[in-house]
Curated annotation (Swiss-Prot):
Organism from which the protein derives: Yersinia pestis
Name of this protein: 6,7-dimethyl-8-ribityllumazine synthase
Alphabetical GO biological process terms: riboflavin biosynthetic process
Cross-referenced PANTHER family: 6,7-DIMETHYL-8-RIBITYLLUMAZINE SYNTHASE (PTHR21058:SF0), 6,7-DIMETHYL-8-RIBITYLLUMAZINE SYNTHASE DMRL SYNTHASE LUMAZINE SYNTHASE (PTHR21058)
This protein's pathway: Cofactor biosynthesis; riboflavin biosynthesis; riboflavin from 2-hydroxy-3-oxobutyl phosphate and 5-amino-6-(D-ribitylamino)uracil: step 1/2
């Protein structure tokens, strides 16, 4: 039986982080967590990390697609926060961000890690950005690194 598993230590990985400015008081913590995980656990150097700011979560798939098509990155990490409000806007933005990022991953053959919080409240978002529920930015970074290695192992 063959078993393929990825590791997170990936010193030569080239990683792009696409991050939404909207709700940046939360997203800044996601970014800090992602960069810390890339550098401390993944051993990725500053020179191999590119951060691209976009207006909001809805814009993440387009930028992730452009980044993936450059062939300069081994993975893209998408970070953002969508908080439910009193209108259907939440469903549209969260749904399009999720399906768009998934589509980029499927069509580009590079990992696109989903670090977009979709929460019911600001409190839930804060918890997932580094307090009670860990840091989802760091988790997305580790997912990206592991997937880089899984795909490399599959391709041989």
């Amino acid at each position: 039986m063959n078993v393929i598993e990825g590791v997170v230590a990936t010193p030569n990985a080239r990683v792009a982080i696409a991050i939404a400015r909207f709700n940046n008081f939360i997203n800044d913590s996601l970014l800090d967590g992602a960069i810390d995980a890339l550098k401390r656990i993944g051993q990725v150097s500053d020179d191999n990390i590119t951060v691209v700011w976009v207006p909001g979560a809805y814009e993440l798939p387009l930028v992730a697609n452009v980044l993936a098509k450059t062939n300069r990155y081994d993975a893209v990490i998408a970070l953002g926060t969508v908080i439910r409000g009193g209108t259907a806007h939440f469903e549209y933005v969260a749904g399009e961000a999720s399906s768009g990022l998934s589509s980029v991953a499927m069509n580009s053959d590079i990992p696109v890690a989903f670090g977009v919080l979709t929460t019911e409240s600001i409190e839930q978002a804060i918890e997932r950005a580094g307090t009670k529920a860990g840091n989802k930015g760091a988790e997305a970074a580790l997912t990206a690194l592991e997937m880089i290695n899984v795909i490399k192992a599959i391709k041989g």
